Design a protein with these regions (language model features):
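Aromatic- and glycine-rich beta-strand/loop motifs that create alpha-glucan
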Residues: 1-22
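Alpha-helical transmembrane segments of multi-pass membrane transporters/translocases
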Residues: 2, 23, 212-248
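Membrane-helix interface segments
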Residues: 16-19, 89-95, 170-174
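Hydrophobic alpha-helical membrane-insertion segments
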Residues: 22-27, 99-117, 175-192
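Secretory targeting signals
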Residues: 29-69, 95-166, 208-228
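Transmembrane helix segments
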Residues: 31-39, 165-203
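Hydrophobic/aromatic residues in alpha-helical transmembrane segments
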Residues: 63-67, 76, 80, 115, ...
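Transmembrane helix boundary and interhelical loop/hinge segments in multi-pass membrane proteins
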Residues: 67-86, 90, 248
Length: 248
């Protein structure tokens, strides 16, 4: 397992995008920090900081691309057969890919948090990120809460992406998910149990920023965390099961 994880990490680090994209994203975060200094009525320093200067969104985009190719490229180049010839089990192979993706996603999110703190101190040196008042969390704790919610929400998307990459056609999936998103919005008010559907779970990324969004999701933040973790577990188990049965 350890050898496979090292190999998967090597494949990712060998790609130029693994290093170039984070640099570009950090520059975009710096740009947003600068814009916030010029248009602070539109982009307040507090909101810009707690949203990590949109850094989580950029890194989430990169992670989705990496998740969509981490399995498919093995089949495209035929390297999957080489791994099987080396007597690695299919379960070990797919689990090593999931662990690698988790490691790189954790690294990206830590980079985003550190970059946000540096950018905040660079452009808003009078911003106290440690001070809290009443029931209001400090800006740093708000950033950490948003990062946790976004991390969980992104992993729900990543687990779906891995499931898709293992089993189905992406076009069909995204078309179906778009239709379901419209339907769930219309029916959520009428059918209470629909609030537990996976598409609604993705709203955790919005609700960590805006607590009032619970009126739309019909769920409290802790319920969204539980629902996301449950779906992520189910989807990843399905990924392992389908990969074991997949024709190679």
């Amino acid at each position: 397992m350890g050898t496979l994880i090292k190999q998967e990490c090597f494949k990712l680090f060998k790609k130029k995008s693994t290093f170039i994209a984070p640099i570009v994203f950090i520059l975009l975060m710096v740009a947003q920090g600068y814009i916030a200094t010029k248009y602070n009525k539109i982009f307040t320093p507090q909101e810009s900081f707690t949203s990590a200067y949109n850094g989580f969104s950029w890194f989430a985009f990169l992670l989705i691309i990496q998740a969509s190719t981490i399995i498919s490229m093995e089949f495209h180049y035929g390297t999957i057969k080489n791994l099987l010839y080396r007597e690695y089990s299919r379960t070990t192979m797919i689990v090593s890919k999931i662990i690698t993706l988790f490691i790189i996603s954790l690294i990206y999110f830590v980079i985003t948090i550190i970059a946000s703190i540096v950018i905040g101190s660079l452009f808003f040196n009078d911003l106290n990120i440690f001070e809290s008042s009443g029931n209001q969390l400090s800006l740093l704790n708000q950033l950490l809460l948003v990062s946790l919610g976004t991390f969980v929400g992104v992993w729900l998307v990543l687990s779906l992406t891995l499931l898709l990459s293992s089993a189905t056609n992406s076009t069909v999936f995204y078309l179906a998910s778009s239709i379901l998103a419209v339907i769930q919005t219309a029916l959520l008010e009428k059918i209470d149990w629909l609030k537990w559907n996976p598409i609604n779970m993705m709203n955790i990324m919005l609700q960590t920023v805006e607590k009032g969004f619970s009126k739309s999701t019909k769920l409290e933040l802790h319920e969204l965390f539980i629902g996301n973790i449950a779906y992520i577990s189910i989807f990843l188990i399905l990924v392992v099961f389908i990969f074991k049965k997949k024709n190679i």
